Amino acid sequence: MGKCQVISHPLIQHKLSILRRQTTSTKDFRELVNEIAMLMGYEVSRDLPLEDVDIQTPVSKTVQKQLAGKKLAIVPILRAGIGMVDGLLSLVPAAKVGHIGMYRNEETLEPVEYLVKLPEDINQRQIFLVDPMLATGGSAILAVDSLKKRGAANIKFVCLVAAPEGVKKLQEAHPDIDIFTAALDDHLNEHGYIVPGLGDAGDRLFGTK
């Protein structure tokens, strides 16, 4: 079974508290999502493999470390996942970026996929699948399904806020997936929103209703 890790770094928790506030502006919300994603990236990438490399400093030759193994791909679930991409790219600027488009049917609460655009070598890459919210788990499960259909095998799901119901569903559907979140909240309400949550991340990121 994949793990669910809550990243409780003080800076992340401080910024998340501001992010949750109803009075936080669109501009500040967007910046905070970017900053939290970047800070989470350090923990999410902790187990990336390293290899020895010979280099010449201004003083002498030395053997140091550099990233090795599979290349990275960052795949946001549209539209809200877009807000997390730049923060992660600031750490791994050579990563490719794919897109999986989803919207939620407000009557059934089920996700509907409308776009899949991925690097051609997605099956050779370690993937950070990103979405600010893990609520019902439906979108995350469908996105992982899409990635696995295209040969992807090394996938981490990264979100800012998760509900226990969504974590349980994702782990049951894909027990090989590790989940990284900044907060594990209380529950989902009758509308499928995380409580206390932070509202609709997409609307708050882009200033829409």
Swiss-Prot record:
Cofactor remark from the record: Binds 1 Mg(2+) ion per subunit. The magnesium is bound as Mg-PRPP.
Highest taxon listed in the record's lineage: Bacteria
A GO biological process held by the record: UMP salvage
Protein's pathway: Pyrimidine metabolism; UMP biosynthesis via salvage pathway; UMP from uracil: step 1/1
The protein's required cofactors: Mg(2+)
EC number(s) given by UniProt: 2.4.2.9
Keywords: Allosteric enzyme, Glycosyltransferase, GTP-binding, Magnesium, Nucleotide-binding, Transferase
UniProt activity-regulation remark: Allosterically activated by GTP.
Amino acids binding uracil: 194, 199-201
InterPro entries: PRibTrfase_dom, PRTase-like, Upp_B, UPRTase/APRTase, Ura_phspho_trans
GO MF terms, alphabetically ordered: GTP binding; magnesium ion binding; uracil phosphoribosyltransferase activity
Catalytic activity of the protein: UMP + diphosphate = 5-phospho-alpha-D-ribose 1-diphosphate + uracil
Gene3D superfamilies noted in UniProt: 3.40.50.2020
Protein's UniProt keywords contain Cell membrane: no
Record: residues binding 5-phospho-alpha-D-ribose 1-diphosphate: 79, 104, 131-139, 200
Pfam families referenced in this protein's UniProt entry, alphabetically: UPRTase
Job of this protein: Catalyzes the conversion of uracil and 5-phospho-alpha-D-ribose 1-diphosphate (PRPP) to UMP and diphosphate.
Similarity-based family: Belongs to the UPRTase family.
Cited HAMAP family: Upp_B
The protein's name: Uracil phosphoribosyltransferase
Organism: Streptococcus pyogenes serotype M1
